[in-house]
Amino acid sequence: MASRDLAESLLPVGGGAATATATATAHDEYDERAYDSDDKVSIAVSDSDSEDGGGGGGDAMRPAFSWRKLWRFTGPGFLMCIAFLDPGNLEGDLQAGAAAGYQLLWLLLWATVMGALVQLLSARLGVATGKHLAELCREEYPPWATRALWAMTELALVGADIQEVIGSAIAIKILSAGTVPLWGGVVITAFDCFIFLFLENYGVRKLEAFFGVLIAVMAVSFAIMFGETKPSGKELLIGLVVPKLSSRTIKQAVGIVGCIIMPHNVFLHSALVQSRKIDTNKKSRVQEAVFYYNIESILALIVSFFINICVTTVFAKGFYGSEQADGIGLENAGQYLQQKYGTAFFPILYIWAIGLLASGQSSTITGTYAGQFVMGGFLNLRLKKWLRAMITRSFAIIPTMIVALFFDTEDPTMDILNEALNVLQSIQIPFALIPLITLVSKEQVMGSFVVGPITKVISWIVTVFLMLINGYLILSFYATEVRGALVRSSLCVVLAVYLAFIVYLIMRNTSLYSRLRSAMTKST
């Protein structure tokens, strides 16, 4: 019964309430838009799609299911799922497999389910309001809070991009047999924004097709590895359904959960769903869009889950319980695979590198895409596409080049840096999830598409759980890597400000906050 209520609450609430788009104000002529009207994809597959069926009333019925219509909506979910397949996730997968074998597959499954819930809410927000999360944050919060949220999101983007670009650079180094150094791979990867701009000029569907090819490359590469290494099917199934967690695999468990929810991906998905031409004055059309986006997002995440399973089980079969298990990472995983399995159909080292390159390239380009929406939405900047892409690319590529020049992939310091980058992204998660849940729970924002009470409660439980998991990661890093009384004291002050901001975001829409604010206003 609870699962049925949850499913129903992810669809619009019935009744005569006006649609969210009827209550939302139209975009100002000078406001930043996710997509111009000329760039949007038509979803009409028949003459009935342009008729006035359904209207905007509360009794409007969603049009009948159509496979052709689903195909028209397919795309945004697959761009979104790339964040579940970035080099950081692949590293978490291989380390979990090497350190814990098949034992953490159940956690990977449920982490993906939690990620799916977050992304479905993000898509719902974008469709129902006609605006993406960054824009709505600018309207919801005062200027100082908006700037703070923007800064936090940009930091998360930079942290993710460094890992993604380094992942691509490692793959290029492997494929070039070491001819191209790490910094050279970074330079090559830096030009991916030009590929992005080139494809974007040819339309959204061409861009989506390009990402579809990259996902297919990953799926084929890692499926070939799965076939060559032949992991145990029985242990795989047991790992999926039987929860196991030991003290020695806590770090890998935290890594799996922490990598799934990427802050910038929440902002990205709410913008991507606006790439279709939807008559937002008709409730039935908005309801239809939410329905199809839910389906295609779930299908995309099933694909990403399959790829993550392949990577985890390959390294579980090859390295669980071995001497290499503790020291394996992106930079040496290919060599270890080659030593273990040699050459069968094609050198497994290069199969790994091809999959890693597809992962790195796709995630860096989607990072650039997300950066455009984040900057434009929070700051209300209307810039030319090429200029926004160059600015957002520069934010990340400069620190990445510094990392590539001063660190070697086999240097132990690189592991510390990766851990620091994971922490950097972890601390940003509340600043994406709290505004998201706050907004989808407000009838003034969502209209009749406001989420139901069961979905709201589950969403807050997931958010608190993720915050606790990532809090553990932060405290672990603080205890093991932070040295010096002055540095620790400074970080304690920063932590206090950080927690205060989180409390503010949570309490801002409560009656207690309203009473406190009213009392403070009267006292002044």
UniProtKB/Swiss-Prot annotation:
Signal sequence region: none
Membrane topology listed for this record: Multi-pass membrane protein
GO annotation, cellular component aspect: membrane
UniProt-annotated location(s): Membrane
GO BP annotations, alphabetical order: iron ion transmembrane transport; manganese ion transport
Cross-referenced Pfam families: Nramp (PF01566)
Record keyword Ion transport present: yes
Major site of localization recorded for this protein: membrane
Keywords: Ion transport, Iron, Iron transport, Membrane, Transmembrane, Transmembrane helix, Transport
InterPro entries in UniProt: NRAMP_fam
Region (Disordered): 34-58
Membrane-spanning parts: 70-90, 98-118, 155-175, 179-199, 207-227, 253-273, 295-315, 341-361, 389-409, 420-440, 457-477, 486-506
Molecular function, one GO term: cadmium ion transmembrane transporter activity
Annotated function: Probable metal transporter.
NCBIfam families membership: nramp, Nramp_1
PANTHER family the UniProt entry points to: NATURAL RESISTANCE-ASSOCIATED MACROPHAGE PROTEIN 2, SOLUTE CARRIER PROTEIN FAMILY 11 MEMBER
Family: Belongs to the NRAMP (TC 2.A.55) family.
Designated name of the protein: Metal transporter Nramp2
Organism: Oryza sativa subsp. japonica
Lineage: Eukaryota, Viridiplantae, Streptophyta, Embryophyta, Tracheophyta
Gene: NRAMP2
